[in-house]
């Protein structure tokens, strides 16, 4: 795929992922051994993206530190100082909307998609997926092979083709003009400047949009969907770490080399992150974050935050950063 610039909005607070987002921005929450944003950037870099604009907000300095410490991408950081919708976020990055095509990709969703399908596209294109209940998503209606209408979170379903958060914009200046119209005329939907409204305005002005199918679409916005994403990412891995003496690893798992695991059964679908300590425990279908301690316990479908400590009995729990929990029998 020819080199492409990516625009990645990551400003959201992540209220549905509390307590983990009390101390971290949502995109830095750990899944399968690294932050959500790390998996997204890894995929973009592997597919030829060489530069990006990252739109930060809540705890944006932590995002900047993570990206600059771990990636050599040419990255520009732009702050969204008010949470006024996705359209407003992209407007904050309007200097990146020039003549060359751009890829807008949401920073809290992991995709399994071959972006090379976009390189030969003459027109802008939206990633879509069929869903049973479209009321939580923006949706598209197509006529004659092109998008004719976009609707943000329709109360009455008009289409089951959900917009998943991947937008290939072949003429970014047209998007910039549409966003400028929304902002200048204070055109909001449900109190926010919606990107779907800007795209609809482009369609109304004659811009052509096609769609492309995205089968692998993994939301990281809630604890249960974060665990689903963890399962998917672990399943994709071929490497299996060797279990220390006295331990059993049931694939697929991720165990960071710096983690200490003693007398434990890990997996399936378990992630043990950097500096974590697991002793006398069973951990399955769970995420144990950096420097967390888990002992004398069986965990299932749980997320343990950074520097948290959990001991006790069989449980399904979500524990925020730096917490200490001792469960009695």
Regions from the language model: what does each represent?
Residues 53-57, 128, 287, 303:
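Short internal beta-strands
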Residues 110-186:
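Conserved core of the sugar-phosphate nucleotidyltransferase
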